[in-house]
Regions:
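Short active-site segment of divalent metal-dependent hydrolases/proteases
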Residues: 43-45
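Divalent-metal coordination cores built from histidine and acidic residues
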Residues: 27, 31, 36-39, 53-171, ...
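Histidine-rich, glycine-flanked metal-binding segment
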Residues: 1-33
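Short pre-active-site segment immediately N-terminal to the catalytic Zn-binding motif
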Residues: 47-52
Length: 217
């Protein structure tokens, strides 16, 4: 039994006469599953692919997606169009741009690194850039690799105040356990996890911090 787009009850065939329905569908040879999720997509990554993405999602049973990083204007427009045409697009949840430090990784430097992020190179920019995303009603936030520990902790504080979940990569300036303890709700990929599970993880982190402080050395 489906009510308002949700499967609310499953009964035996012999009991179908007990269920009142405005419409019945013969399911012989068919099957029914809940809508699938794609929890990691980037509408902004490929301009040529983007026009076909919604139709491809629906054709494969994907009815909800998380856009995990892209220019705020672009992903907001994608979400708005999905809301306006719910039968032609999945439910779209957006993070806005990756919240990165300096230099930001996805900075439009090449086709492999399109502009998916916002750089935070000033002490106050984390507050202003994060507040902009909050004001534009993003569904969650995504932390990225080049954030300093101080920037990361400030991002977590702001997210907690707003009740927003934060997903992302483990910043190069931190280890996995510190990032999770600070409030990270999810990990996208397993990048940077290997250092935290090494037997000499403290030494490796110290070496990495030295490289981050002196990138040209």
């Amino acid at each position: 039994l489906i009510k308002q787009g949700r499967i609310t009850e499953i009964t035996n065939y012999e009991e179908t006469d007990k269920v009142f329905s405005m419409r019945s569908i013969d399911g012989e040879g068919l099957y029914l599953i809940p809508g699938l999720w794609d929890a990691h997509v980037h509408y902004a990554f490929d301009d040529n692919m983007r026009p076909a993405m919604n139709a491809l999602f629906l054709a494969h049973g994907v009815t909800s997606v998380r856009d995990t990083g892209g220019p705020l204007g672009l992903v907001t427009e994608v979400r708005n169009r999905a809301l306006e045409q719910p039968t032609k697009a999945p439910n779209v949840y957006i993070a806005g741009p990756l919240i990165d430090g300096t230099p930001n990784v996805y900075n439009d430097s090449s086709p492999s690194y399109p502009l998916l992020s916002v750089e935070n190179n000033l002490p106050t920019s984390i507050q202003s850039n994060t507040q902009l995303l909050i004001d534009n009603q993003v569904d969650f936030l995504k932390a990225y690799e080049m954030l300093s520990e101080a920037q990361y902790l400030e991002l977590m504080r702001l997210a907690s105040e707003e009740g927003l979940l934060v997903t992302g990569h483990i910043p190069l300036s931190m280890d996995l356990f510190s990032a999770v303890e600070a409030g990270l709700n999810g990990m996208e990929h397993l990048r940077n996890i290997e250092m935290s599970i090494a037997t000499n993880s403290r030494e490796l982190l110290k070496e990495r911090l030295s490289i981050l402080e002196n990138p040209d050395s």
